[in-house]
């Protein structure tokens, strides 16, 4: 999963090591990280 995150965003996701689109509930947390979400 880590390599997938690194591949998609070009940087390690950190505390979250799974695709963001799987759980829309965590989207706000991902947004605070500063990742370009596909939502």
From Swiss-Prot:
Keywords tagged on the record: Amidation, Cleavage on pair of basic residues, Hormone, Secreted
Protein name in the entry: Pro-opiomelanocortin
Family to which this protein belongs: Belongs to the POMC family.
Superkingdom, natural source: Eukaryota
Protein localization: Secreted
SMART domains: ACTH_domain
Modified residues (Valine amide): 13
Gene name of this polypeptide: POMC
Keyword Nucleus: no
GO biological process, one term: regulation of corticosterone secretion
Organism from which the protein derives: Struthio camelus (Common ostrich)
Functional description taken from the UniProt entry: Precursor protein for pituitary hormones that regulate stress and environmental adaptation.
A UniProt-annotated Pfam family: ACTH_domain
InterPro entries with a match to the protein in the record: Mcrtin_ACTH_cent, PMOC, POMC-derived_peptides
Keyword Transport belongs to the record: no
Molecular functions per Gene Ontology: G protein-coupled receptor binding; hormone activity
Record-level GO cellular component terms: extracellular space; secretory granule
């Amino acid at each position: 999963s880590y390599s997938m995150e690194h591949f998609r965003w070009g940087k390690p996701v950190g505390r979250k090591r799974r695709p963001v689109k799987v759980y829309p509930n965590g989207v706000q947390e991902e947004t605070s990280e500063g990742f370009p979400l596909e939502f």
